Curated annotation (Swiss-Prot):
Coiled coil: none annotated. It is found in: Cytoplasm. The gene is panC/cmk. This is Bifunctional pantoate ligase/cytidylate kinase. Residues 1-279 are annotated as: Pantoate--beta-alanine ligase.
Length: 515
């Protein structure tokens, strides 16, 4: 992971990657003091981009005169360690003079309709400061995607508007708010709360839950939703209400005829700590399909799954890389591939991160406990042991749980041995790819050669493939088999493009999706 403090070094990093085909850069902007909410943003950005930049900058222009800039926490070393562990490629942590070399000078002034309501009432100038720094960093990084949290709903609306009005490229991806188990939204400011104050602050999520309950019961009047939230908050001694609003999520204005979704948001103070949270009600997201591709090793699953994901705009989850990551770690710790108990414990403890690659020989980047092991997990020794390691129920159950968490929202493609039969048995489209042993051996030889690795005799490769097939099909837990509702596609005599065209046709016919 690189850490840079200057604009010149950041631009050099970006320019070095710009000419590389397939590079998609993601950006997560933060003010540091990173917590699990930030981690969730970074983790999603890591999955969806080939290169990930995180900025850490306590932006002085978004602090008001009554807000203590010097008091804001700055645990930089801990923040860098979290970024390193999550597989971040570059952290941009500039001093104030680097982003504001001539002082605060030029400013971006967003639409007052978005900034003179809600948080803007008590924080004049705040959103101009936010818009200015976002415009600066977005222009410097030029990301394909930039990730922001739903907790800062007004900030998200402002950023979307500014990026649209100023033609700043990159898609704004809004990620769900992360809450602690007690219900309080994660915030860097939570550290200021005493135990008693935290208990008081829990009235905020309770109040929003009340609004959600009323909505579920048919209430659509914004005034009634606001009244219910205020009632819960007002009943909590020691809590000061700053505002409660029920507005259009994009325009932050009253809804017309009570139609469409509503953003119910509130800001409160507990002691000297200001807290915000919100909930969007009535926003329907139609889940995109899940596509499961199963089959034996060497049938072309990974290549086709990646290309299909690119064509459809889906997220590709490289399940094989996850099992290889566990196998690599087990080999590092000299764990016997037959020791299911130790392997299961290892899988629960190890932290795996995946990202799209930008080299044809290594199309998935892999991190294990913060260390990039993209090449190491493709080593022949790992290939020989991965089937044995993945056969243990404890290993599979943990990785399957992770895969389900990533894919449950839909719009994903997974390939493996048991995706359609076990991981996502209700996937909307299931494909079973197969090919002869002879064809798969030839493909394996070509793959090894492309990676600059030793190529065994073709008969040795055939025997290895037969052995792997036998292991996969005879394991006790979730063995390789064709799902009853899967469509079998033999790839022996077809090019990758021919097979891809057939899969796209199946997607149109079976799911009704557009390509």
């Amino acid at each position: 992971m690189k850490v840079v403090e200057t604009v010149a070094r950041l631009e050099a990093f970006r320019r070095a990657r710009a000419p590389v085909a397939g590079v998609e850069m993601g950006l997560v902007m933060t003010m540091g003091a990173l917590h699990e909410g930030h981690r969730s943003l970074i983790a999603r950005a890591r999955r969806e981009n080939t290169v990930l930049v995180v900025s850490i900058f306590v932006n002085p222009t978004q602090f008001g005169s009554s807000e203590d800039l010097s008091r804001y926490p700055r645990p930089l070393e801990a923040d860098l360690e979290l970024c390193r562990h999550e597989g971040v490629d570059l952290v941009f942590a500039p001093p104030e003079s680097e982003l504001y070399p001539l002082g605060s000078g030029t400013k971006v002034v967003p639409d007052p309709a978005l900034t003179e309501v809600m948080c803007g009432l008590s924080r004049p100038g705040h959103f101009s400061g936010v818009a200015t720094v976002v415009a600066k960093v977005m222009n410097l990084v030029q990301p394909v995607r930039a990730y922001f949290g739903q907790k800062d709903a007004q900030q998200v609306a402002v950023i979307k508007s500014v990026c649209c009005d100023l033609n700043i490229g990159g898609r704004i991806v809004v990620c769900p708010t992360v809450h602690d188990p007690d219900g309080l939204a994660l915030s860097s400011r939570n550290v200021y709360l005493s135990s008693a104050q935290r208990s008081t602050a829990l009235a905020l999520p309770r109040a929003l839950d009340k609004a959600a309950h009323l909505w579920a019961g048919g209430e659509r009047q914004a005034s009634e939703l606001e009244r219910a939230v205020r009632s819960v908050l007002a009943s909590e001694p020691g809590l000061e209400i700053e505002y409660v609003a029920a507005v259009d999520p994009e325009r932050l204005a009253p809804r017309q005829d009570n139609a469409g979704p509503v953003l119910v948001a509130a800001a409160v103070r507990v002691g000297s700590t200001r807290l915000i949270d919100n909930v969007v009600l009535g926003q329907h997201h139609e889940r995109r399909p899940i596509i499961a591709i199963d089959g034996p090793a060497g049938a072309g699953k990974s290549t086709l799954a990646r290309r299909l994901a690119q064509r459809l705009g889906f997220l590709y989850i490289d399940t094989g890389a996850m099992y290889r990551a566990v196998t690599w770690r087990a080999m590092q710790e000299r764990i016997d591939p037959l020791d299911g108990e130790r392997l299961s414990a290892l899988t629960r403890a190890v932290r795996i991160r995946l990202a799209p690659g930008y080299q044809s020989a290594f199309p998935t980047r892999v991190w294990v406990d913060g260390e990039e092991v993209t090449r190491a997990v493709r080593d022949e020794a790992v290939s020989l042991h991965v089937s044995a390691v993945s056969s243990h129920p404890g290993v599979r159950s943990e990785l399957v749980a992770q895969q389900r968490r990533i894919g449950e929202a839909g719009g994903v493609i997974l390939d493996g041995r048991d995706i359609g039969t076990h991981v996502f048995s209700r996937a909307e489209l299931k494909i079973y790819l197969t090919a002869s042993v002879e064809e798969r051996a030839l493909r394996r030889a070509d793959d090894l050669k492309a990676k600059g690795l030793p190529v065994p005799d073709i008969e040795v490769l055939k025997e290895q493939i037969r052995s792997r097939d036998n292991q996969d099909m005879s394991r006790a837990y979730a063995p390789l088999r064709k799902a009853d509702d899967a469509i079998e596609v033999n790839t022996d005599t077809f090019t990758v493009q021919d097979t891809l065209d057939r899969l796209l046709a199946l997607y149109r016919d079976k799911v009704g999706g557009s390509v």
